């Protein structure tokens, strides 16, 4: 406590300040703490009050209508939290609603107010997501805070472990022998590019001719993705004639030797494709042949890039779909007849497989061939490796353009050009199916009408005798027939009497 005393005079003034501080007693501190706690409500009370406001603010005809059981729960928890245990007598039979409320309240027993508040808020959490977002609901959410529990899923952890182990297996450089072939997987394009670079470095040491070819391919900055193929020797045998344009015979003859030497030294597969002589030389091959791992799975898809490449191959220029491989590529041309077109020689490493979107290429006759624009086809043979590897073909036009290789002979890919005809066939089949369905529906309608008419006729025939005689008539014959049988003798006698009377008059 602080006391200040002041005194002022006419000629002078003096000020006396006396400060007296009383001792802080422990019971005073406990009393003040109780008063402060009484003034500041607890967290449960604030949440309870916010939840009560939400329930009270619900419109009668709103989108959210709680059930009677739910309202009884809220009522019982509210009464228990505000008034404590139920001490009232049960209402009479004339107040059924009051009896239901009393039963719900008394069922809580000796539950404390704090527990009732917590239960009220917990029930509110169950339905708060189905309620419309209002200011009261926002206030309640702000008071409650995040009330979702994070549960660790053991299955997800196991799946993550499996994926990590699978990633380790994929990233490992060890090769596994499967069905007589060496199989190893790469984790992605980066690891494949690294392996390609290592193979390029190893190829540089093979000879000076190979170095020249590798430098030419490196200058083009092409993406090289190498997949694992078959392990074993490869015999290269191509029996085909190369016809090129006479105007570019000089440069092609100079580039022919390095290309052949590099392909023989590195053991590459040579894939022949042709280009029309009328096409612009500037529109050379562009795009990327994506080399993917050829596993034994029947259906798989590497990425969304596959679909983009497919669209590019189906809709692009016929001469712009050959991509230079990083191992060996050279334009091999020889002077001769220039009427057919110029050829591109694409060298692909022997143990690899050239794929586009993970699909195989196969000609209609089952053997690799190359076509010309005039419809001519020139077959060339090759020595196959493994169980099903074959040299793919590249034909001109959007329908015949595909680079691929077979896996184990278990999966055969269709030509990309057949997709258009396949779609047309599917459309025709659907149209015919619709026509057949319409015919079937018409026949069914006719059958239904015939059966209905026959049923009506049968009902009419069955109802005809019953309509001729009433239900109360005991005899089998109709009443008219019976009346005619009774009356006709009298009629006959009357007619005979009339005849005799006329005869007598004539005689008289």
Curated annotation (Swiss-Prot):
Residues 181-214, 428-453 form a coiled coil. It is a single-pass membrane protein. Residues 198-215, 240-260, 353-376, 408-418 have a biased composition (Basic and acidic residues). The modification N6-acetyllysine is found at residue 446. GO terms for biological process: pexophagy. The modification Phosphoserine is found at residues 184-185, 187, 191, 206, 233, 303, 405. The lineage of its organism: Eukaryota, Metazoa, Chordata, Craniata, Vertebrata. Belongs to the ATG37 family. It holds the Pfam family ACBP. PANTHER family: ACYL-COA-BINDING DOMAIN-CONTAINING PROTEIN 5, ACYL-COA-BINDING PROTEIN, ACBP. It is found in: Peroxisome membrane. An acyl-CoA binds at residues 55-64, 75-79, 101, 120. One of its GO terms (cellular component) is peroxisomal membrane. The keyword Transport applies. This is Acyl-CoA-binding domain-containing protein 5. GO terms for molecular function: fatty-acyl-CoA binding. The chain crosses the membrane at residues 480-500. Residues 44-133 form the ACB domain. InterPro entries: ACBD5, Acyl-CoA-binding_prot_CS, Acyl-CoA-binding_protein, Acyl-CoA-binding_sf, FERM/acyl-CoA-bd_prot_sf. Acyl-CoA binding protein which acts as the peroxisome receptor for pexophagy but is dispensable for aggrephagy and nonselective autophagy. Binds medium- and long-chain acyl-CoA esters. Keywords: Acetylation, Autophagy, Coiled coil, Lipid-binding, Membrane, Peroxisome, Phosphoprotein, Transmembrane, Transmembrane helix, Transport. Residues 175-215, 240-300, 318-340, 353-419 are annotated as: Disordered. SUPFAM superfamilies: Acyl-CoA binding protein.
